[in-house]
């Protein structure tokens, strides 16, 4: 009986120590933090790149609509990390985006590719690490619905596997 009590006390002490531990920075990707926008979730240090409609992918997003460069702008990601329909804002700006596209180079990364309306704007953006506020998470189900018929491609299968695992 004494051993049982010692184990309970030891377990309680271990739980208290673990819960007091400071969060560790991950070398792999962004960190979640509370956001300043009500109901939003902040993700710090997100790697972003830029693309435009004159590149290989053309002027349509993954769901067949024109890429948007106004109001809520188009963005691409690995949908297993940021699903189709995810809405976010870059902290410190009024720029709001919606994930409506994906790219092969993004699969397996925490990178978001931001749509820019010209090559000059794309080059100006370059590669930046920014904090974002997630305003609304996209839909795993919608992502799978769009990706399902395209599963013959290896990168699509990787996104599907990530979505099904989540």
Question: How should each PLM-predicted stretch be described?
Answer:
Residues 1-26:
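N-terminal secretion targeting segments of exported proteins
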Residues 21-166:
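Solvent-exposed, well-ordered loop and adjacent helix/strand elements within mature globular domains
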């Amino acid at each position: 009986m004494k051993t049982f009590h010692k184990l309970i006390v030891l377990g309680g002490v271990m739980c208290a120590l673990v819960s007091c531990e400071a969060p560790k920075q991950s070398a792999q990707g962004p960190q979640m933090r509370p956001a300043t926008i009500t109901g939003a979730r902040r993700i710090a240090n997100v790697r972003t790149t830029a693309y435009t409609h004159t590149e290989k992918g053309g002027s349509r997003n993954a769901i067949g609509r024109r890429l948007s460069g106004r109001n809520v702008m188009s963005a691409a990601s690995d949908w297993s990390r940021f699903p189709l329909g995810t809405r976010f804002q870059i902290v410190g700006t009024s720029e709001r985006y919606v994930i409506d596209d994906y790219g092969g180079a993004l699969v397996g990364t925490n990178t978001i590719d931001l749509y820019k309306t010209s090559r000059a704007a794309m080059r100006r953006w370059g590669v930046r690490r920014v904090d974002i506020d997630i305003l609304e998470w996209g839909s795993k189900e919608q992502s799978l619905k769009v990706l399902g018929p395209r599963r013959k491609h290896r990168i699509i299968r990787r996104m599907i596997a990530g979505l099904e695992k989540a």
